[in-house]
Amino acid sequence: IRDRSPSRGLGDVYKRQHAGQVYINDGFNMVWMTPHEGIPASGLAQEDFRRDTNDDGSDGVRVRYLGAEYATRWGVDVSNHQGTIDWAALKRQGIDFAYLRLGLRGYGEKGSLYPDRSFDSYYSGARAAGIEVGVYFFSQAATVQEAAQEALYALQLLDGRDLDLPVYYDWEPVQQEDSRTLHNNEFLLTSQARTFCALIEQGGYEAGVYMNRQQGYYRYDLSSMGNIALWIADPGDYPDFYYRFDVWQYDHGARLDGVNEIVDLNVEFVPVM
């Protein structure tokens, strides 16, 4: 693992003070962290990545991995908010995969479950264009029982459809007074994710958890989540989440031909054996 700390050249005293720690961006600040034992580090560094440049010299939309440890693929994640999508146009631009929102739970006290209205058309269009498909479920579960309910609802919505990629549990905090999930702690959130993923796997699909850096460091207990796939939201030109992950969401506001609205962009990492 390459050393990301500022201690190089700062003397033995400084190094001893932070022995066994790594210097990371937690999404808020640069901080020292003692890594969990038994969780592999990503080993990725800034020099492993390069953003494409447009003909006019401006930044392109694609970020490429230059290293040799992984093969990478380029993808989008979309929901009904993106409207009508020309999937063939996305394929022509090099999109390899898409994560489609399958359904969601509402923010308010009732917390009703809903399908994504565009899922069926997106699924058909993406597969017809030769784009591999995975899905995510937007969770607002406030209990383990509700996470189980969401998993069973997701399986009902999938109705046996073939997927190329995992079903991801996408729990996100909602900062408003009537949010039903304001008090979800680390233990509860981790238990919810594990329950959701276990039921999805029992249904015959791969499962994973979507999270940002703050959640990965402070809200989920990654040491108890086994080999569950991780999808990390870490916007920028290179990923600096310390632990190993499977998918990197690097842009929340890209423009691509074939999509009228802005779209999220992702890189999938496939280890080279």
Model-identified regions with their sequence ranges:
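Accessory recognition modules or surfaces
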Residues: 165-172, 216-233
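Single conserved hydrophobic/aromatic residue that forms the stacking wall/gate
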Residues: 1-14
